[in-house]
Structures are given as structure tokens and as C-alpha cells.
């Protein structure tokens, strides 16, 4: 046989450690889902879409099945092998996929412990499970050997398997919704900015590899039960913006694995409708301008957790007249205190920046009081004297800035839950 020649076997393959032989079904190329029979081999064409091959039910020792990538398309549309209740290579948690171009596999059923074992194959790692963790839920992405699940709304994180090389833990980021800033019909005594949503995070290198966590990361990862199961995920909405005289709204809490991040506090108002003090929360809302000087912003890290999930809102101007309101608190910095004058609103406090998804993203910054800037990381929004304030960005948990002159404040930003672990 010349060097480099390719042999196309369209007959019968024998032995391979099995008691039977593979009779290749050359007259019936499989382009859709099918159930395999003992002793048969199949050419599978996935060029038009993924295909699932279901292995025979109630197999006996020595049963044999073959499969070959007919169109060299498994790398585009993978073949899924449905275990049909039996292990593959001793694993019985997942139905494995074959995504290697040109793959050719002979599977022999050995016993109830190991199940089907590939004896002649291009993918010797094929097995019905993983040595690490397997799970589903949210939007799934990969970063090297690590998988990331991002939940931008309520959902379920389902652990299918915890393998023998897994430490049974995941890293997490739980961000609550941000609070709304105040709104006032007048042109003096700026309302306070909304507080950023509570921010909680863990990092354990043996769990999820090397990445840059926020300063708030808890070094002890939240353990996940070694038994497969489901974990409800709650993602909090941002507090709704208000019209002049409206009572500001806190953000809503986010939670996962029994851990909760509190919603950001609403900013304070002071106007002809009466005074509304800033509210506590994951991070506190900024103090209202006007009234007594030196009013404090809403408390952060409420209820208290360690490390703290947020910081207090900024106070109002310490002197009259025309006192500026305070900026909303952020995850890593208190809101800035207001200063005297019509443009004296404090800026929002800085949020927290984390690379848990593979790229750095800032979340849970505070909103600015009128004419006060947004949080320096951009997750909160600035105050506005002459128009409505902007809504804080979705899934970043920032507080919204406050408004004056009859304008409305924007919504706080919704939260997010992110989970990261090793999967291969």
C-alpha cells in the first residue's frame, strides 16, 4: 500500500475485542436521529444539522456498534451519542458529543460498570460524563478549561455531575438591582443619587482558574453539593425611576446558593411634596439636598455581610445655601458628599470590577446627584438638571442619577448572577 493512502472500508469489520462484527450500512447514510442496532456500523452525515445516535437498549456483553463521520462535518454539527441508560467508559451522567472532523468509533459493550467502551476510535476520551463538573443553565460560555454561566434573569442552575477530579465548588458573582435617584420640581437643593446594587463574589483558583477578581471577592468558594441537583437563581430588577415628588425605589435583591445581595437604596428627595430621606441597601442612596445641613446618605452593606456588599451614600452639602445632594454609594466607594451651589451634587461611588467572565466588567456603581457625575466606572448614571436622567445599564446593577426642574429620574440597572467552575 503506498504511503499516505486511505482505505475506505465498506464491508465487515471483525474482532476489535468484541464477540461479534460490525456490518457497515453503506446503503443508508444517516442524516437524522436514529437508534443503532447491535452489530451495525453507520455513516452519519451532519452537514445539514446535528444528529443523535441512540445506543441499543438492554445490551449484552460483546455487543458492538460503529459510527463514522461521512461528510467530515462533525466539527460543524456534532454527533450526540444517547447512552440509553448505560454508562460510556464508566460515566453515566451525560450523553457525549463527538465534534472531531472525520471521527470513526467502534463501541463495545463490556459490562454494567463500564458500559460501552470505544476500542477503535479517533476520540479515545469519549465517555458519558466528565472528570470535573457538568452543569446547565443561563447563557453558557467557555474560557479555557472553565465554564461560565451568566443569568440575566431568573433561572435554574442544574448540576448534572461532579466528577472525581472536581473539588465540588463553583465561584460566583451575585449582583442586585440598583436604586433610583430622586426627582424634584424645583431648581435648588438637589435630590440624591441611587445606590448601586449589592455585590458579592468569590474566587478560588483551584475551582475556576486564574482571573482577576474584584477587591470584594471572598476567598472561600461556595460549595456545590456532590449530588446532582437544581439551584434556583434570582436576578433583581433595578428600582423604577420616579417623577417629581415621587418616592424613590430601591433595587431588588439577587440570590443564588442561599446567598443574597441586597438591592441598592433609593436617593433622597426634598421638595414641596415633603422630604424623603435616602434609603439603605446593598449600597445606600445619596442624601437629599436642602433642610438641615450635614444629612447622611443611606447606609450600605444592609443587611451586613462580610466582605461588605456595598458602601453608604454621600451626605448633603455641609453648608447653606442651595445644598447639593449626595451621590449614591457604590460597591467599593461611598457616594461623594454634595457641595454648596446649584451644581453641587456629589458623584456616585465606584463599583467593583471583575474578570470572572474572562474580561473585566464594572458593576454596582452609584448614581450621581444633580450635576454630579456617574460612578467613575460607568455602571451608575449621572444626575441631570435640564432633562430626564438616563436609565442605568441592564445587568450592571448601577444606581440612577437624580433629576430636577420637573424632570424624571431613570431606572436603576438590573442585576446579574455569574457562575464559574472547571469542566474539563
Task: Give, region by region, the residue ranges found by the protein language model.
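Glycine-biased low-complexity/repetitive sequence motifs
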Residues: 1-50, 57-424
Amino acid at each position: 500500500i503506498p504511503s499516505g493512502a486511505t482505505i475506505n472500508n465498506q464491508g465487515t469489520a471483525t474482532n476489535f475485542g468484541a464477540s461479534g462484527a460490525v456490518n457497515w450500512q453503506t446503503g443508508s447514510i444517516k442524516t437524522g436521529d436514529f437508534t443503532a442496532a447491535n452489530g451495525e456500523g453507520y455513516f452519519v452525515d451532519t452537514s445539514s444539522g446535528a444528529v443523535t445516535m441512540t445506543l441499543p437498549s438492554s445490551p449484552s456483553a460483546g455487543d458492538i456498534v460503529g459510527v463514522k463521520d461521512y461528510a467530515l462535518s462533525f466539527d460543524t454539527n456534532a454527533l450526540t451519542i444517547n447512552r440509553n441508560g448505560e454508562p460510556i467508559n464508566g460515566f453515566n451522567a451525560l450523553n457525549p458529543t463527538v465534534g472531531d472532523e472525520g471521527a470513526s468509533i467502534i463501541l463495545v459493550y463490556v459490562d454494567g460498570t463500564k458500559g460501552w467502551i470505544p476500542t477503535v476510535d479517533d476520540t479515545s476520551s469519549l465517555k458519558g460524563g466528565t472528570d470535573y463538573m457538568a452543569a446547565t443553565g443561563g447563557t453558557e460560555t467557555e474560557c479555557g478549561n472553565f465554564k461560565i454561566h451568566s443569568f440575566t434573569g431568573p433561572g435554574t442552575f442544574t448540576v448534572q455531575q461532579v466528577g472525581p477530579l472536581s473539588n465540588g465548588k463553583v465561584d460566583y458573582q451575585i449582583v442586585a438591582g440598583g436604586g433610583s435617584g430622586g426627582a424634584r420640581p424645583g431648581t435648588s437643593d438637589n435630590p440624591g443619587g441611587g445606590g448601586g446594587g449589592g455585590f458579592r463574589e468569590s474566587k478560588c483558583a483551584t475551582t475556576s482558574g486564574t482571573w482577576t477578581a474584584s477587591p470584594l471577592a471572598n476567598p472561600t468558594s461556595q460549595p456545590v453539593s456532590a449530588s446532582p441537583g437544581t439551584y434556583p437563581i434570582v436576578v433583581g430588577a433595578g428600582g423604577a425611576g420616579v417623577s417629581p415628588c415621587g418616592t424613590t425605589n430601591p433595587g431588588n435583591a439577587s440570590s443564588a446558593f442561599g446567598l443574597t445581595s441586597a438591592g441598592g437604596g433609593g436617593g433622597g428627595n426634598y421638595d414641596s411634596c415633603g422630604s424623603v430621606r435616602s434609603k439603605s441597601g446593598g449600597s445606600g442612596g445619596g442624601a437629599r439636598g436642602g433642610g438641615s445641613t450635614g444629612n447622611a446618605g443611606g447606609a450600605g452593606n444592609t443587611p451586613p455581610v462580610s466582605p461588605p456588599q456595598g458602601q453608604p451614600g454621600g451626605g448633603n452639602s455641609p453648608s447653606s445655601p442651595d445644598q447639593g445632594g449626595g451621590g449614591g454609594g457604590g460597591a467599593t466607594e461611598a457616594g461623594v458628599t454634595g457641595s454648596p451651589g446649584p451644581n453641587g451634587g456629589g458623584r456616585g461611588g465606584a463599583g467593583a470590577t471583575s474578570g470572572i467572565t474572562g474580561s473585566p466588567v464594572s458593576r454596582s456603581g452609584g448614581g450621581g446627584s444633580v450635576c454630579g457625575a456617574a460612578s467613575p466606572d460607568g455602571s451608575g448614571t449621572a444626575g441631570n438638571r435640564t432633562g430626564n436622567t438616563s436609565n442605568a445599564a441592564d445587568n450592571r446593577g448601577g444606581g440612577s442619577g437624580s433629576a430636577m426642574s420637573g424632570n424624571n429620574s431613570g431606572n436603576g440597572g438590573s442585576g446579574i448572577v455569574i457562575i464559574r467552575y472547571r469542566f474539563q
